[in-house]
Amino acid sequence: MIRFFLLSFCLLLLSGIEAQTVGLLTNTPAAFNGYTLVAPTGATRTHLIDNCGRVINQWDSEFRAGEAAYLLNDGSLLRTARQSSTVFTGGGMGGRLERFNWDGELMWSYTLANDTAHHHHDMAWMPNGHVLIMAWEYRSPEQAAAAGRLDDGPLWPPMIIEVVPEGTEGGQVVWEWHAWDHLIQNANPDLPNYGNPSDHPGRFDVNYGEVSSGGGPGGPGSGTGGDWFHCNAVAFHPGLNQIVLNSRNWNEFYILDHATSTEEAAGLAGDLLYRWGNPAAYGRGTSTDQVLYTQHDPHWLTDEGPTSLGGNPDATMLVYNNGNARPSGPASTVDELTLPLQPDGTYFLADGDAYGPASLDWSYPQFPFLDFFSPNISGAQRQPNGNTLICEGNGGQLFEITPDGDIVWEYITAYSQFGAVAQGENPIGNSTFRAYRYAPDHPAFDGRDMSPGDPVESNPLPFDCQLYPAAKDTTAQGLPTEKIELTFGPNPARSILRIESNFPIRWTLRDIAGRSLMDAMITSRHHTIDVSNLPAGAYLMVVAQEHGSHSSTHKILIEP
């Protein structure tokens, strides 16, 4: 990334123009052409820009951003907004959801900001028109002590509610989940939640983790509040009917079952299906096993672009790993991993072990360095062409990389809580929670005037930016869209496994915990794999077209 900033700076010096500080820095033919939604933290305006950084649309609110914002299929904007509180003061303060139509008119709002619960950071729009809302839930020092907490003070555990919007304001809560219903502790044997946390990985150790309060936008501060988990992301997988919830303070993310009633979610059925990032949080590891460091934005790749290894996008997660307290030093990475998803929707866990995988499928950069580091907020989004759009949130730096890590598009958020940033001035307050790019054929743009306006920044420099439109079908860059015709056998296999395919494919053989054992790209119709050196047992064969447009996972048995 440094080389592009230096190149841009040098070009401006050569042309006699003052240095560029915000807006578009780089756009190349290798970037995925689309429209990027940018909602600066604390600002009241949200922009949709093209790849040249020019405004396509904008929405104004009376309320400052409460972090997340999304463009829905009908062209409406769903955003979070800030509401003050006398109880909750943590970073990522929200409290209000707003939905504006394409023309900027407020269609609907919902407020969750009282003395017992307060929305923060994120929400997830569901295909049925419901919305999942993440919130802090207040628990008094007395309640914390009664649950076995040894420290004094209140706790704000996470809760999730599902709301059906009604009219122009409000809605009906039809489902809810509370972390408080899923606690375990080994300090007081007289309490009903007594047990060994390592024997109950689906529950939260009530004595794990410190609390925080206050802090700047998007990150926890220090103080005497009860921000215990500091969850900062929630996402929904409609096919699996599962929810992912992210905890910055615990350095792990969780997957919950949504195929439950509220009553069931309060019991064993509401325990965690899966957790990953920090096995020490559930007594199955130490600090040396930790792999996530104050991370943000874990989400499935189902509705985005191809996976890096051609695996099953329903079992592949992308996460921005911020890197605070990383042993090698503060540095961020964007990490991709394959979850040990089983056919029944559960996740494999060996007795006494931590949840897999033990290794990543892909990580950018390969070697973390301080020049790429955001201590809070941030996110990443896989593009249909296999690139990844990264939001290095603290400085409002957005950039797109190829699978090999080459930067092909760069932009610095040109708007802040103080308004448009003047070109040439140092941007202050332009931190950006996340950024999302939408393809030109996204349904939100059907029938819309997509003519570009001016750049977002004030006093923009003269520039000659060219767009590089992609083909209409952006799902696989013109590759055949029919599914793979695949046969393999024998199954069970002993020494040789044969694969036949009508398209070039990439295959990956994984153990049942999701660890990659071997992989290859094959272009011939017939292919043979030597499995004679593998121990007998069950394995997963992940097969995908060359660019990941179609994929499937198969169970393979190997006999001695």
Protein language model annotation of sequence segments:
Residues 8, 474, 505:
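Short, surface-exposed linear motifs at loops/turns and structural transition points
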Residues 20-474:
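Histidine-/acidic-rich catalytic cores in large beta-rich domains
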Residues 15-19:
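Sec/Tat signal peptide C-region and signal peptidase I cleavage site
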Residues 4-13:
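Sec-dependent N-terminal signal peptides
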Residues 50-51, 480-560:
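C-terminal outer-membrane/trafficking sorting elements
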